[in-house]
Curated annotation (Swiss-Prot):
Keyword list, A-Z: Riboflavin biosynthesis, Transferase
Superkingdom of the organism of origin: Bacteria
Role description: Catalyzes the formation of 6,7-dimethyl-8-ribityllumazine by condensation of 5-amino-6-(D-ribitylamino)uracil with 3,4-dihydroxy-2-butanone 4-phosphate. This is the penultimate step in the biosynthesis of riboflavin.
InterPro entries: LS, LS/RS, LS/RS_sf
Binding site for (2S)-2-hydroxy-3-oxobutyl phosphate: E95, T96, R137
Gene encoding the protein: ribH
Annotated protein name in UniProt: 6,7-dimethyl-8-ribityllumazine synthase
One of the GO BP terms on file: riboflavin biosynthetic process
EC number(s) from the headed UniProt entry: 2.5.1.78
Keyword Transferase: yes
Catalytic residues (positions): H98
Keyword presence, Transferase: yes
Molecular function in Gene Ontology: 6,7-dimethyl-8-ribityllumazine synthase activity
C-alpha cells in the first residue's frame, strides 16, 4: 500500500503517483474555436511539465478542426516516437446535425487510432452545448488530458 504522499486523485479516484519523466508525448490541437483550444492546450502543457514531462519531449501540432485530429494522431502513432498522444479540440452545438456528426466521428476516430496502434490517447475534444460550458471546462479538461496520458503510459508499462 502506498502512502498518501505518493498518490494523486484523478476524476475522484486515488491512483499511484503519475511519473512523466522521459515520456514522449504528441499533441494534436484543432484550431477551430482557437481561443478555447489554445487555453485547453496551455492547461495541458503546464500540467505535463508539472508531471515531469520535458518540453523537448513534446511535439505539438495543429489541424483545422476536430475531424482532422484522428488522421494527425494516426500519423504520429505510426512513427512510434510517442509514449502517448493527446487530442485537443472543442465542438460547440449549433443549429444543425453537424455537431453530432463531428462529435461522433472525431471521437470514434481517436478511439480507433488508439486501439489500432496500441497507443494511449487522452481525448480532450470537448463537446458542449454552448461557449460558456466550454470556458467552464477548458482548464480542468486540459489538465485532465495530461494526467490521463501519463497515467495510461504508466499503466500500460505495468500491464506489459
Amino acid at each position: 500500500m502506498q502512502d498518501a504522499d505518493t498518490q494523486t486523485t484523478i476524476f475522484g479516484n486515488t491512483v499511484a503517483e503519475l511519473v512523466g519523466e522521459n515520456l514522449r508525448i504528441g499533441i494534436v490541437q484543432a484550431r477551430f474555436n482557437a481561443a478555447l483550444t489554445d487555453r485547453l492546450a496551455q492547461a495541458c502543457l503546464v500540467e505535463l511539465e508539472l508531471l515531469g514531462v520535458s518540453a523537448k519531449h513534446i511535439e505539438h501540432v495543429s489541424v483545422p478542426g476536430a475531424l482532422e485530429i484522428p488522421i494527425a494522431l494516426q500519423a504520429m502513432a505510426r512513427r512510434k516516437d510517442f509514449d502517448a498522444l493527446i487530442a485537443l479540440g472543442c465542438i460547440i452545438r449549433g443549429e444543425t446535425y453537424h455537431f453530432e456528426l463531428v462529435s461522433n466521428e472525431s471521437g470514434a476516430g481517436v478511439t480507433r487510432v488508439s486501439l489500432d496502434h496500441a497507443t494511449p490517447i487522452a481525448n480532450a475534444i470537448l463537446t458542449v452545448e454552448n461557449e460558456d460550458q466550454a470556458w467552464a471546462r477548458v482548464d480542468d479538461k486540459g489538465r485532465d488530458a495530461a494526467r490521463v496520458a501519463v497515467e495510461m503510459v504508466n499503466l500500460m508499462e505495468e500491464l506489459s
